[in-house]
C-alpha cells in the first residue's frame, strides 16, 4: 500500500467498525464466551481476481492484535470456486465481528480487480493502458484505486488535488481553452505547486489551441470516434500524453487502443462492477 493511502484506509476501517458494531456485537456477546478461540478460512466461490487481502489483515488486527493470519494466496491471484485465500485464528468474538466488514471490502475490491482485468487483458499486447476515473463509491476511492492496479489497470488522478483537469465546464466558464490553460499555469506558479495539467478537447481544432497556449501534460479526446482519435493522435505527434474518454465500452476498447492513444479512461471499472462471491467459514 502506498504510504499516502494509509490514513484513508485507517479512517475507512474505523467507520466500518462503528457503523457495523456500534455499541457491541450483541449476537456474539450473548452466546460466544469472550475467551473462546477458533479458526476460519476465506473461501472463494467464483472465478476472478483476488484483491483486498492486505486490507482484510488490517481489519482483523484492528479488532484483535493477537489474530494469527496464515496467507495462502496473494492479491492479484486468479481464483476459482473452492480456493482458500487465507486462514485466520483468534478470539471467536473478534472473528465474527470482522466477518462482514472484511467480506464487504474484499468482495468489492475483487469485483473491481476482476472487471479491470477483463479490460486490461483485451489490449495487453498494445501500447495503450486502461485508466480508472473518479466515479467511485464515496469514502472507498483508495480501495477502488488499489483494486484497479491489482487488476492490471492504471490509476488516473486520485482527486481534485493531484492534477488539474480542464474539462468542458471549466473551459466554457474560463472563456476558452487558452485562458483556461494560461490560468492553470499562472495558478501553479503562484502557489508553487508541481502537478500535471490535462486539458479536454472536443475537436481537432481544439488541439491547436492547446499548443498555442503553451501545451499541457496530457490531452483528453472527449467522445471522439476511433477514426477521429487516430487523427488526433497523429496531430499531437508525441508532444504530450493522450487519453480517450467518453462512452468507450469493452466492445469498442480495442478499436480505440489501436489508434495509438496512450490511455483510455473507463468509468465502468469502478461503477459497473459485480462483487466477487466469497465467504468466511469456520474450519
Where are these predicted regions, by residue range?
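A short helix->loop->beta-strand "cap" motif at the edges of active sites that frequently abuts
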Residues: 240
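Cys/His-rich Zn2+-binding cysteine-cluster or related metal-binding knuckle/ribbon modules and their
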Residues: 250
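Acidic/glycine-rich phosphate/pyrophosphate-binding loops and surrounding catalytic core
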Residues: 1-213, 218, 227-235, 243, ...
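Short secondary-structure boundary segments
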Residues: 222-223, 246, 268-269
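Active-site loop ensemble at the mouth of alpha/beta enzyme cores that anchors a bound cofactor
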Residues: 279-283
Amino acid at each position: 500500500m502506498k504510504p499516502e493511502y494509509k490514513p484513508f484506509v485507517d479512517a475507512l476501517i474505523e467507520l466500518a467498525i462503528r457503523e457495523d458494531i456500534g455499541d457491541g456485537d450483541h449476537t456474539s456477546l450473548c452466546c460466544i464466551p469472550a475467551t473462546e478461540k477458533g479458526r476460519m478460512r476465506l473461501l472463494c466461490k467464483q472465478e476472478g481476481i483476488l484483491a483486498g487481502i492486505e486490507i482484510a489483515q488490517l481489519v482483523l488486527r484492528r479488532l484483535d492484535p493477537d489474530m494469527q493470519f496464515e496467507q495462502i494466496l496473494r492479491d492479484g491471484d486468479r481464483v476459482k470456486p473452492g480456493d482458500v485465500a487465507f486462514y485466520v485464528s483468534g478470539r471467536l468474538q473478534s472473528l465474527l465481528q470482522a466477518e462482514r466488514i472484511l467480506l464487504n471490502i474484499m468482495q468489492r475490491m475483487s469485483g473491481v480487480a476482476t472487471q479491470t482485468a477483463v479490460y486490461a487483458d483485451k489490449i495487453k499486447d498494445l501500447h495503450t493502458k486502461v485508466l480508472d476515473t473518479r466515479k467511485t463509491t464515496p469514502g472507498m476511492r483508495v480501495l477502488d484505486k488499489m483494486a484497479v492496479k491489482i487488476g492490471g489497470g492504471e490509476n488516473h488522478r486520485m482527486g481534485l488535488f493531484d492534477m488539474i483537469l480542464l474539462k468542458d465546464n471549466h473551459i466554457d466558464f474560463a472563456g476558452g481553452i487558452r485562458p483556461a490553460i494560461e490560468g492553470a499555469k499562472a495558478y501553479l506558479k503562484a502557489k508553487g505547486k508541481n502537478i500535471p495539467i490535462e486539458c479536454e478537447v472536443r475537436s481537432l481544432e481544439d488541439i491547436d489551441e492547446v499548443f498555442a497556449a503553451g501545451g499541457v501534460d496530457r490531452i483528453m479526446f472527449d467522445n471522439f470516434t476511433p477514426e477521429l482519435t487516430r487523427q488526433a493522435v497523429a496531430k499531437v505527434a508525441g508532444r504530450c500524453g493522450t487519453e480517450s474518454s467518453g462512452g468507450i465500452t469493452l466492445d469498442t476498447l480495442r478499436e480505440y487502443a489501436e489508434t495509438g492513444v496512450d490511455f483510455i479512461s473507463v468509468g465502468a471499472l469502478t461503477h459497473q462492477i459485480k462483487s466477487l462471491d466469497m465467504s468466511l467459514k469456520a474450519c
